[in-house]
Amino acid sequence: MSQAHFRLYHKDVVFATLIPAEEWLYDWYARCGYTQHITCTPPPADVDSMDFDTFDRWQRSKPCIVLHDKEGFDIVKEDFRIAQAIDPDAKRQQNDISSMIRIINAEMALTLYAGCHPEKEENIRVYNDSDIPMNNIYFCIKKGKVTRTNYPLPDTRSLTIQELADYIFADDTLLMTLMLN
């Protein structure tokens, strides 16, 4: 898992999401920096007959959702079509599923956060991210911008990478949909 996180960081990925297959995995993924601050919701009822533009309007109407691009949308639709060919009783997800999110790039995540909260002024220290040591640094959020430094800042809030995700999404109901389960 550490290697996967490190590789994702170098591909400029900001967040990683997953749906644990079994209950005990929630604790295991939490030790890897994931937090249960995201819900996987069922897709719109008529998603199989939607074109991407219609789906895109639907997903963008949500206040805080993981966005799918056209390629991802087409892949998920094709995978479901294949699943139904194998098992005609296969059904799309019907219930909300507690899922998990991890910050891969703290600076990029805080930059997105600062852009949405230009009134926010705070110093944050991320610590104890053993998977991505580049995240373990001080950040100053001010006037919609983020700066990073190796030097301690005054009145700093210290957060683990998991706590940082909880901090960033504290006021949001984060959703994802169209996940293969």
Predicted features by range, described:
Residues 1, 10-11, 26-27:
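Conserved glycine-rich acetyl-CoA-binding loop
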Residues 1-6, 31, 84:
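Conserved acetyl-CoA-binding loop-helix of GNAT-fold acetyltransferases
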Residues 2-4, 23-24, 37, 42:
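Core nucleotidyl-transferase/polymerase catalytic module
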Residues 6-21:
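Conserved GNAT acetyl-CoA-binding A-motif
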Residues 17-19, 84, 125:
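Short, hydrophobic beta-strand segments that form beta-sheet elements in well-ordered domains
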Residues 24-28, 32-33:
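Alpha-helical scaffold elements adjacent to nucleotide-binding pockets in ATP/GTP-utilizing enzyme cores
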Residues 33-122:
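Amide-forming acyltransferase catalytic core, primarily the GNAT-like/NAT-type
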Residues 92-181:
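C-terminal functional modules
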